[in-house]
Amino acid sequence: NNGEIQQIDTPYNMFHYPANQFVAGFIGMPGMNFIEVDVIEKDGEIWIKGKNGSFKVNAERANEIRKQAKQNQKAILGIRPEHVVPCENVEDSFFQGTIDVYEMLGYTAILHVQTDDGKIVSSIEENDSYKAGAPINFRLNEDHIHLFDIESGKTICN
């Protein structure tokens, strides 16, 4: 990044455990989704809150976040497209949006979706029931979230 080495590691580790937001966005195709969120501690639990949804972080990740994050701070949530999963119910979802593009690639497909949080990309099994212009809800595979400091871009948790 601007001629400065960001991380020296194996491709596996850079993909799964990026040192910062730059590395996370550089590796992987399609690229990682980035969303501004609030990290909130309430009644001893850590919650991630986006514009239209929130979820409680599991205990292991909550401890990791407590070590690195300031209490009640804004952060950047990173989630790879394969971990953004369509769901039926708005109540179960973190994002709601409208499909811009359905890109079939054989057995897999890429959904490009416009949400209140910006453009989100999801990589799914091909399914011809998805159409451009249709509403869609997504949940996140929470075991695969990344959090980055909003100012420095450094990893808070992988």
PLM segments and residue spans:
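Non-catalytic connector elements of ABC transporters
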Residues: P30-F34, E41-N158
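Internal alpha/beta loop-helix hairpins
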Residues: N1-S54
